[in-house]
Amino acid sequence: MIDIHTLYGKTPYGQNYLFESVLQGMERFDVDYALISSLKAAYYSGPESEAEVLAVCRKHPRLLPVAGIDLRNNFSPEETVFRLKSAGFVAARFFTEINHISLDTPLFRELAAAAEVLQLPLLADAPAGMVSAALRPMGPLTVPIILLSQNAYDNYDVLGAMRERKNLYLEIRGFNSPDILEYLTAHTGSGRLLFGSRAPMDYLLPTRNIVEYSHLLQEDKERILDKNARQIFLNEKGGCTNAAD
C-alpha cells in the first residue's frame, strides 16, 4: 500500500505534526511507502523546507519526498522544476488550500509545462470549478497531475476534466458517500484513483476503509491502494488502466 498524501511540520496555530507519526501509522496499517511534504513549504518557505524533507527521506527510505511550491513566490518555473527533479523529489505539491490561491494562473500553467518536460508529477488541491478553468488554456499533457481533497460535490467539474485529460488522477480521501467509489471507477477506471490519507492531520484508517469496504473487484482495490502509485512515483508497471474498464 502507498499513501500519496502525508505531511509533517509546524503550523502558525500551534500544531506540530511529526514525521515519526507518519512512520508509526505506516507500521500499524501496513503501508509500504508514503509521499511526504513539509508544512514549512505551505506556511513559511518552500526552498527552505527542501533540504529538510530530503534529509528525512534519506534517513527513512520508505518516505518519498514531495516538494512544496508556493505560487506567490515562484517566478522561475523551469529552474524550479529542474532543481526539484535533480534533487530527487518524486513530485511537487501546491498548497492552494492553505495559501488560498488559485491554480487558474499563467504561473501554474508555466510550472505544469516545465513539469511536462521533466515528467515531475504534480499534486494540488483545487476547489470546485477550478480544475477545468486552470487546465483549459493548456495543450495536451502527459505528466500526472493528482487532484487532492476533492469530494462528491465536485464531480461535475472533476469528471469532466478527467474525461478531457488522461493525465489527471484523483485522491479518494474525500469520497466517502455510499457507492461513490464504484461510481468513480465506472466513469474513470480504477487506474485513475489513488489512496491518500493526509496523515497525521487526518486519520489513515477511514480512507483505507473507503476502498476495503467498497464493492469493487479486488484487482481494482489493489490498483487504488498500491499499483497506480507505484507506476507513477516508483516507475513500476502494473497499474494505471486509464479507460473505464
Predicted regions and their residues:
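Mid-to-C-terminal alpha-helical segments outside catalytic/metal-binding sites
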Residues: 2-4, 8, 12, 16-33, ...
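Active-site environment of divalent metal-dependent phosphoester hydrolases
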Residues: 9-12, 41-45, 72-75, 99, ...
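Hydrophobic faces of well-ordered beta-strands that scaffold small-molecule active sites
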Residues: 2-6, 34-36, 64-69, 92-94, ...
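Active-site gating/metal-coordination segments in enzymes
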Residues: 32-33, 44-121
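Conserved, mostly hydrophobic/aromatic
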Residues: 5, 26, 53, 84, ...
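A general structural detector for well-ordered alpha-helical segments in enzyme core domains, enriched
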Residues: 21-25, 49-56, 79-84, 107-111, ...
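Catalytic pocket-lining loop regions of alpha/beta-barrel enzymes
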Residues: 104-194
